[in-house]
Structure formats: structure tokens, C-alpha cells
Amino acid sequence: MKASELRNKTVEELNNELIELRRAQFSLRMQLATQQLNKVDQVGKVRRDIARVRSVLAEKAKAANASQA
């Protein structure tokens, strides 16, 4: 998932994406703990996707505050 794709989404869509990614992260952590996870790199990819979504949300919040001031 690219940051440019995320910037085109609304805040509501980004929040939904964040919830979905958090659920995926939890699932991957449980699979890792029970040694059922084959692709260990997925944990890092999901973590970076969460960071991207949170960064775009912060950008949008900052832009909204700047336009109101």
C-alpha cells in the first residue's frame, strides 16, 4: 500500500483501514506466538502499513487545523 493511494482516501476510510490492519497485526502476532506463521515478514509489512495510515491521518489532521486557523 502506497502513501499516495492513502492520501486519496477520506478520513473515515483511513480509520477503517487502520482498524483492519490492527486486526491483521493481532492475528499475525497470535500465529507467530503459536508458531503457525510461515511468512514472518508479513508482521513487518503490516506494521509499516499501520505507520503509513497513521502518518496520512496526522497529515490530514494538521491540514484541517491549518485551514481552520
Curated annotation (Swiss-Prot):
Any single GO BP term: translation
InterPro entries membership: Ribosomal_protein_uL29, Ribosomal_uL29, Ribosomal_uL29_sf
Keyword annotations of the record: Ribonucleoprotein, Ribosomal protein
UniProt xrefs under Pfam families: Ribosomal_L29 (PF00831)
GO terms for cellular component: cytosolic large ribosomal subunit
A single GO molecular function term of this UniProt record: structural constituent of ribosome
Gene3D superfamilies found in the cross-reference section: 1.10.287.310
Similarity-based family: Belongs to the universal ribosomal protein uL29 family.
PANTHER family the UniProt entry points to: 60S RIBOSOMAL PROTEIN L35/50S RIBOSOMAL PROTEIN L29, LARGE RIBOSOMAL SUBUNIT PROTEIN UL29C
UniProt protein name: Large ribosomal subunit protein uL29
Lineage of origin: Bacteria, Pseudomonadati, Pseudomonadota, Betaproteobacteria, Nitrosomonadales
Gene label: rpmC
